[in-house]
Amino acid sequence: MVFYKYSGSGNDFLIVQSFKKKDFSNLAKQVCHRHEGFGADGLVVVLPSKDYDYEWDFYNSDGSKAGMCGNASRCVGLFAYQHAIASKNHVFLAGKREISICIEEPNIIESNLGNYKILDVIPALRCEKFFSSGSVLEHIPTFYLIDTGVPHLVGFVENKEGLNSLNTLELRALRHEFNANINIAFIENKETIFLQTYERGVEDFTLACGTGMAAVFIAARIFYNTPKKAALIPKSNESLELSLKNDGIFYKGAVRYIGMSVLGMRVFENGCF
């Protein structure tokens, strides 16, 4: 079985094609493992679709399924075009969400992540029990729970240096309390936002998270009156352009093809596929 590795703003993914829906959880855990596998943030299984150019099943590196992943959507869009599965402008199904892809340059991909939902506005009092004394999170007055395909908790710090002082244990506690990815951001100016994401399924900081950037972008737009277009800069320091239009959140940036490989017999013998 051939798989292809792509990277989008620091997130890397293994992409494979399958003509039948199966449970790929064990396969995802093995091939995504950084030391015992090939290493990736997630596995994308591209499947045929009657109503769309294709559909996907997305697996986090721990084998759990997710309905949506922003960076993976851009990576799979380029993969589908390069492998003649779809044209430059196409639509695929991610869980129950339609994702439109536009390839503007050889490696600049824009995806429409669709609409969002504000799930909750959470005062700091509901979160402070998770914070240690002197934590940078103590100074965040309000957190926002936003669904951009998957749920994200968003909070804004007062200065950029605060992003370098985040406590993994505190973010992990918030992740389990709200069953959401955790995003801490700093608005440098109205059009530039820095952020760090603690991602569930990865259970650590990731270099970037597309749906997380979308959630931060929306929270900044609604609650801090930032414009409808902004540059978001995640841990990878790669700038991504996000914009809000009538039909959804648009997310644009570079995608890199890294290489391809073949799954060896050991994977099949262990019953992963």
UniProtKB/Swiss-Prot annotation:
Question: Has the keyword S-adenosyl-L-methionine been applied to this entry?
Answer: no
At the top level, the lineage of the source is Bacteria
SUPFAM superfamilies in the record, alphabetically?
Diaminopimelate epimerase-like
- Reaction catalyzed: (2S,6S)-2,6-diaminopimelate = meso-2,6-diaminopimelate
Q: Does the keyword Repeat apply?
A: no
Where is the site labelled Could be important to modulate the pK values of the two catalytic cysteine residues? H152, E199
Q: In which pathway does it act?
A: Amino-acid biosynthesis; L-lysine biosynthesis via DAP pathway; DL-2,6-diaminopimelate from LL-2,6-diaminopimelate: step 1/1
Q: What is its main location?
A: cytoplasm
| Listed GO biological process terms | lysine biosynthetic process via diaminopimelate
Xref: NCBIfam families: DapF (TIGR00652)
Record's function text: Catalyzes the stereoinversion of LL-2,6-diaminopimelate (L,L-DAP) to meso-diaminopimelate (meso-DAP), a precursor of L-lysine and an essential component of the bacterial peptidoglycan.
Family in the record: Belongs to the diaminopimelate epimerase family.
Q: Which HAMAP family match?
A: DAP_epimerase (MF_00197)
Listed name of the protein: Diaminopimelate epimerase
Originating species: Helicobacter pylori (strain ATCC 700392 / 26695) (Campylobacter pylori)
